[in-house]
Structures are given as C-alpha cells and as structure tokens.
Amino acid sequence: MRMSSFLISSNYVDPKFPPCEEYSHSDYSPGYYGSQKRESSFQHGAPYPRSVSSNSSSSASYSSCQGSVRQSARLPHSSGLVPGEKAHLEPHMPTSSPPSCSLKSSEHKHPDSPEQDPVVYPWMKKAHISKATSTYSDGEAKRSRTAYTRQQVLELEKEFHYNRYLTRRRRVEIAHTLRLSERQIKIWFQNRRMKWKKDHKLPNTKIKSNPSVNLQIAGGSPNQNKGNHVCQ
C-alpha cells in the first residue's frame, strides 16, 4: 500500500527511449567501426605498392570529394544533437559535391572557355604608319599640315596684300589674333611669297645668279658697242 500511494502521489514520468531502429544506424553499430579498422589495417599492411595509373589525378580528386562529404555528414554529431533529431536531418541533407570539386571537374572538361579574353600579341595589332614616315629614322613621325579656317586665310591674305614681309612684332599680333603660332604665320607667308613669285614669273631670289651674265644683260654685248662707235 505504501508503494502504491508513493507512486500515485509523486510526479513520476516514465522515461522514453528512442526506438531501436535509430540505434541500427551504421555510425552506432559496432560492425561499422570494425569494418573501418579492418580496412585501415589492410591498407597499411599491403605488401605491394599501388600501381600508378593514368587516372590517378581523377581518383585523388574523387577521394577528396568523398572525404569532404563525410565531414559534412558528421557535423550534426559535433553540435550535440540527439540521435532522433539526426535521423530527421540526414534525409534532407544535400548530396551535391562541394564547390571545389565541381570547379575542378569543370576545369578538366572545359579548358578553353569562351569567357576568357583572347591574347593579343604586338604583331597582331594594326600599325598606323604611313609609307612616308617609314623613311624617317627612329620612328620620327611626319609633321601634319595645318588646316587653316576660311576666316584665318582671309585675314592672312589681307595682311599679305599690304605687306609681304612681316616684322616680329606684327607676326606676334597676327598670331594672337588668329590663335595661331608664330611658326605657322611664318611658314604661311613663306609659301605665299613663293606662290606670288611664281604667278608673276619673277626669278627666285634664293638662287645665286652669275654676275657676268647680269653685266652683259645690263650693258649689252661688246660687239654691239663697237658697231655703234663705227657708225658714229
């Protein structure tokens, strides 16, 4: 009677143990650990070394992937989960390989992917060098011609009409007004003077003339002078 009254009065709860099916998992069964020990001892005690095959790299990557999958599968044990909760979590765990393994397989499958930029060598580039510049030494580029505007040409023509030779002061003023350099003004006037002499058929002053020829033209030939004296 005392025992029955004690059981009735106390808040005793019957312990609930997990079903026997959960204990039959491979991680808890002694046969699983025994098989692992036998495999490890067989691998260490192998009298003959492994033969190196052509697929050694692929087998190594496959074993590394398998090892990473096993480590990810054993993570719930380290977190201290109840075996019953582990049984619910394991079916939902993904079986895909880690990203490192997938990257290795993609590299072996597609070594030349179209996403990589093509390599451009110097001899593949276009060389924008004209034929005239090829004669210059050290790759010196030819000076480009100055493109004068219509307003600039008109002002220069006016100045040339009044004065064919410019002073330094006037050249600076025109260059400042037309937004040109002094060298450009100087070259334009030189070219314009050459054109003007050619149009008027004037001799080029840069060519040295023979003084004896000039004297004969100015005074006439000596035979003509003798004839004139005889006639007188």
Swiss-Prot record:
**UniProt function note:** Sequence-specific transcription factor which is part of a developmental regulatory system that provides cells with specific positional identities on the anterior-posterior axis.
State the GO CC annotations. nucleoplasm
Set out the biological process GO terms recorded for this chain's protein.
Answer: anterior/posterior pattern specification; embryonic skeletal system morphogenesis; positive regulation of transcription by RNA polymerase II
Q: Report the SUPFAM superfamilies cross-referenced here.
A: Homeodomain-like (SSF46689)
User: Where does it live in the cell?
Assistant: Nucleus
Where along the sequence lies the DNA-binding region?
A: 141-200
Tell me, in one coarse class, where this protein mainly resides: nucleus
User: What family is this protein classified in?
Assistant: Belongs to the Antp homeobox family. Deformed subfamily.
Name the residue ranges of motif: Antp-type hexapeptide: 120-125
- Composition bias type Low complexity, residue spans: 51-68, 94-104
Q: What is this protein called?
A: Homeobox protein Hox-B4
Q: Which SMART domains match?
A: HOX
The entry lists its GO molecular-function terms as: DNA-binding transcription factor activity, RNA polymerase II-specific; RNA polymerase II cis-regulatory region sequence-specific DNA binding
Report residue spans for region: Disordered: 28-117, 210-232
Note whether Isomerase occurs among the keywords.
no
Assigned keywords, A-Z: Developmental protein, DNA-binding, Homeobox, Nucleus, Transcription, Transcription regulation
